[in-house]
Structures are given as C-alpha cells and as structure tokens.
A protein has these predicted regions:
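Nucleotide 5′-phosphate-binding alpha/beta core
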Residues: 1-103, 110-161, 165, 172-214, ...
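Active-site glycine/GP-rich loop and adjacent strand/helix microenvironment
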Residues: 1-14, 18-20, 168-370
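Short, histidine-centered active-site or binding-site loop motifs used for metal coordination
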Residues: 106-108, 278
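Gly/Ser/Thr-rich beta-alpha loop segments that engage phosphate groups in nucleotides
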Residues: 108-111, 311
Length: 370
C-alpha cells in the first residue's frame, strides 16, 4: 500500500513541482516501482535553502515567491508582497495566502523554508497530538496542571503551532506559563550572517553593526530577567502536578538554576509530566545530562512525552514504553541509506535490523514533495 501511494504521489507531484521533475529526469526515474526508486528523488535540507541570499538582502520578495513555487505543489503567485519589509513579513503574507511556510532554526546562518498547505498544517497538528498522547497513555489531558513551556505564542518554527494546541489541553485556568511571549523570528536567526555579508560589500557600516550588537545585548538581558521570573513561578508551583515542555538544553539550564536556589533532586510533585525535544543545540552539558534531568524532576519514562521526528515530517514517531521503540505512522516510509545517502540498504522486513542514515518519504505531504 505504501509503495502504491508513493507511486501515485510521484505521478501527481511531478506535474506540479518543477524541481522534482528536473530531479526525476536527471535520475532517469519515470515511476516508483520499488522503494529504491525514491532515493534519488529525495530532497535534502539544502533544497529548502537554495534561494540566493540576495533575494532576502535586497528585499526581492517576488523572486522569493518564484523560488518557493519551484518547491511547492500549489502556485505561490498569490502571495502579496507589497510593502514587505523583512523575511518575517513575507512569511506572514505567505500564511495569509494559504502557504503555512515554516523556517528552520537557521543555525548555519541561512534558514530553510518549507511550504505547508492548510491541509498539511491541520493534519500534522492532529498527528502530532495523537503521537504525544500515545507516548503517555496513562495520562489524559484534563486541564489540571501547571504548565511551563519555553515556546512563545508566535513565530516561524513549526513546533510553535503544535505547542499552542498541545499545552493548553493540560493547563488549569491561569496556569499556562511561557518563558517569554517574544516571538521566534526568522529575521533574527538570519541577521548575523546577513550583516557579515553586507559589511563585506560595504552596504552597512560599523554604526549599524554596533546598533545590532546593542540590541542583542538588551534582548539577552531581558531574556535573563524573564528566565528568573519563570524560575520563580516554577519553584512556587513545584508541589502541584506539572507539565514541563522544553528542549534538553533549556531543561539542563533549569536544573542548574534551581539547584543554585537550593532545590533538591526529586523535590517536585510525583505526578509531574515532561516533554523534551530539539537536542541540546550546542549547550555545554555533562554526558549524563538526561539522567540528571530526570532525577532532578523525579520523572520516570512513562511520564515523558517522547518521540522521534524531523520538522519535515507530518506528525511524530511516538516512543512506546516499556519497549523503548518508536511507532512510525503509516504515511511515513522510512528509508535507511548508506553513509553518502545514495543507496537503500534494505528494509527491516528483509533483514530484521538495518543500520544507516535515516531518510523518509511522507505520503501525507500536500504542499510539497514528501
């Protein structure tokens, strides 16, 4: 069934997505007759950041529309770019036109932009919620907890939409506590690399660089104050059932901050739930940071909402206890590749176990190639 669905998707998307058609011609693939036929057609993250940086630097938003259209199933010429000032306004206009584009974190200095249709967004949110519930089956969202999350209410990261529907289901009235309401903006992730380019070409001067650095310092100071206030709230609520949703790097930061305040390991309500994600994002952590975090909050595996996913996926692969395995949704076709990412190594059905680079094809994707 998966192979047949992939075959149908390819035949449909090849007519809609210019880059896919070009890739298929270069690879000599005319139909999907085996999973191996998908491999040369897979898009890497670099495809979604293949726009010339000059488009963003020079405010050439019509060109960004055209670029996005080469990777999208639906026409993007309906995105109104009149008076757009920066990348975040372009993303807002795209969403208003039915293109729910989300940005990567842009740690390399150049963000990826992946298109989602409204159907993609709605189905993905439902799938993510189902996976979250599947990983903690003994607990039901009942608006009874003090909820703490690092995710702001607005921004360009895909997980913001998910957190906006996940956490309110658990929060008691008045007990939904965000680290900050400051939006997560693509512009700020891209700005340092952009300034370096513009400085090299003489388009900005030292004064603009100094102003940017002062802005960053002020924001860091504000963030530190927000974090301290957030810790005050967490300490005051620790005797209640909690739901704490953070990335591992922030979780470790919480552990350090509260230990410095004299909070002991396990000094939290025994029914506390947690969810983690995103890795440590370069934070300096000890090798046993996961064990220390769990011990500090006193949580056990069955009280952790856990999954495996990439932002490109529709939904998550829920972690199943007590087997410590992941439930792959039926619309995700896992493909285990060799190190160069060019050859399919086989399937679990063939050998029982396959080890290699993880790739996947998402049958559910509507707004782009899966």
């Amino acid at each position: 069934l998966q192979l047949e669905a992939a075959r149908e998707r390819f035949a449909e998307r090849r007519q809609q997505i210019r880059v896919l058609d070009k890739r298929a011609k270069e690879a000599g693939v005319d139909s999907i007759d085996s999973l191996a036929d998908l491999v040369p057609l897979l898009f890497a993250h670099t495809n979604y950041k293949s726009y010339p940086e000059a488009f963003v630097d020079n405010g050439q938003w019509k060109h960004m529309n055209i670029w996005l259209g080469t990777l999208s199933s639906h026409a993007t010429d309906n995105i109104d770019v009149a008076d757009v000032r920066d990348i975040d306004e372009w993303l807002d206009r795209a969403r208003a036109a039915g293109h729910h584009v989300f940005a990567s974190s842009g740690t390399s200095g150049k963000s990826s932009f992946l298109n989602q249709s409204t159907q993609d967004r709605d189905l993905s949110l439902a799938a993510c919620l189902a996976a979250a519930d599947l990983s903690t089956p003994a607990y039901v969202p009942d608006h009874s907890r003090s909820v703490f999350t690092m995710m702001p209410p607005r921004g360009t990261h895909k997980m913001i939409d998910f957190c906006n529907v996940l956490f309110p289901r658990w929060a008691a009235p008045g007990e939904f506590h965000r680290l900050s309401d400051y939006p997560m903006r693509a512009f700020e992730a891209m700005r340092p690399a952009q300034l370096r380019r513009l400085l090299a070409t003489g388009k900005v001067g030292p004064g603009e660089i100094a102003a940017y650095e002062a802005e960053i310092e002020a924001r860091q100071q504000a963030r530190a104050g927000e974090f301290d206030a957030w810790m005050d709230l967490l300490v005051s609520r620790r005797d209640r059932p909690l739901y704490v949703g953070v990335m591992y790097g922030v979780a470790w930061q919480i552990v350090q901050a509260l230990r410095a305040r004299g909070i002991k390991d396990g000094d939290f309500h025994p029914d506390t739930l947690m969810s983690f994600g995103g890795g440590t994002k370069g934070a300096a952590v000890p090798t046993d940071y996961k064990e220390q975090i769990m011990g500090f909050f006193g949580v056990t595996p069955e009280r952790i909402t856990s999954s495996y996913a990439m932002v490109e996926m529709s939904g998550f692969c829920a972690k199943i206890q007590p087997t410590e395995s992941y439930a792959v949704p039926p619309w995700i076709i896992p493909l285990i590749l060799d190190k160069p990412g060019e050859t399919l190594l086989g399937t679990i059905k063939d050998t029982g176990q396959v080890e290699g680079r993880m790739a996947f094809f998402d049958i559910l994707a509507d707004g782009r190639w899966g």
